[in-house]
């Protein structure tokens, strides 16, 4: 039987990790849900670069500050505020039928959210092999009577194969995202971001800092060979998707305002 992953800081959402095993979890099942309670009070979600075109239509895309910058989808402008999912983890932008089943959703849910509660992890620090693990505290996986099987005998079910493939693709997307950020840094295109919003009736603007964004002025001043490189690599439309998405910050602010969750004018770190 595979041993548990070695102790290390757990990623966002995860409370614990166990390797998925046909010996231990032979009778376990996955049950569907339209709720994501683990999202409650989370305002910044990791995003892969290839998701930028879809995500920019709905949410601001920023980068975390510091040398280890990562792209983040902003679900709120303040710690603990999520304007797209309610406290029960249900999407607020959906149309439901009389039974409460979602029949239409215009919202893009980032892959990082869809991946949970699964994760590819190294069971030993020096191992090169990644094993499919899961968070045992999740309420969607367990020894249920209902739901889809994880194993057929001692073999992974079609569902488990699909989960494994999704996680494999996510890891590859993560590597491409890290390379994208590195190239932005090599070109010195990331700068400290700041957004100032003057709300009606407020004596001071609401100022949000503590994140990074692409410096559009420097982008426009790139040398011909540098610009040609990011055009040929496919980076340029992704950069503009990020820049276009920043207009969504005001929409998120308006949503927070309607929810009564605007913190008084101050400096706020969203990342």
Question: Predicted regions: what is each one?
Answer:
Residues 120-271:
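A contiguous, surface-oriented mixed alpha/beta subdomain in the mid-to-C-terminal portion of proteins
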Residues 1-76:
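Short, extreme N-terminal leader segments that mark the start of a protein/domain
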Residues 54, 111-112, 188-190:
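Short solvent-exposed loop/turn micro-motifs enriched in small/polar/acidic residues
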Residues 64-66, 70-150:
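Aromatic- and glycine-enriched beta-alpha-beta binding-site module
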Residues 53, 105, 211:
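Short, glycine/acidic-rich beta->alpha junctions
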Residues 30-36, 44-47, 102-108, 163-170, ...:
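N-terminal start-of-chain detector that recognizes signal peptides
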């Amino acid at each position: 039987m595979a041993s548990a992953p070695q102790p290390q800081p757990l990623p966002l959402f995860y409370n614990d990790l166990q390797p998925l095993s046909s010996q231990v979890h032979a009778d376990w099942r996955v049950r569907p849900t339209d709720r994501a309670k683990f999202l409650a009070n989370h305002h910044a979600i990791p995003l892969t670069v290839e998701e930028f075109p879809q995500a920019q239509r709905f949410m601001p895309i920023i980068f975390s500050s510091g040398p280890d910058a990562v792209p983040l989808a902003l679900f709120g402008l303040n710690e603990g505020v999520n304007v797209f999912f309610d406290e029960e983890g249900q999407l607020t932008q959906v149309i439901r039928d009389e039974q409460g089943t979602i029949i239409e959703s215009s919202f893009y849910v980032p892959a990082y959210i869809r991946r949970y509660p699964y994760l590819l992890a190294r069971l030993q620090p020096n191992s090169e092999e990644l094993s499919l693990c899961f968070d045992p505290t999740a309420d969607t996986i367990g020894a249920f009577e209902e739901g889809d099987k994880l194993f057929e005998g001692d073999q992974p079910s079609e569902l488990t194969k699909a989960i494994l493939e999704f996680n494999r693709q996510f890891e590859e997307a993560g590597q491409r995202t890290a390379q994208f950020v590195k190239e932005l840094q090599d070109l010195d295109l990331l700068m400290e971001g700041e957004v100032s919003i003057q709300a009606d009736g407020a004596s001071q603007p609401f100022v949000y800092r503590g994140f990074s964004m692409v410096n559009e002025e420097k982008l426009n001043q790139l040398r011909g060979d540098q610009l040609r490189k990011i055009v040929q690599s496919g980076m340029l439309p992704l950069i503009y998707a990020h820049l276009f998405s920043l207009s969504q910050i005001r929409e998120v602010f308006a949503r927070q305002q309607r929810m009564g969750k605007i913190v008084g004018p101050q400096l706020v770190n969203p990342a």
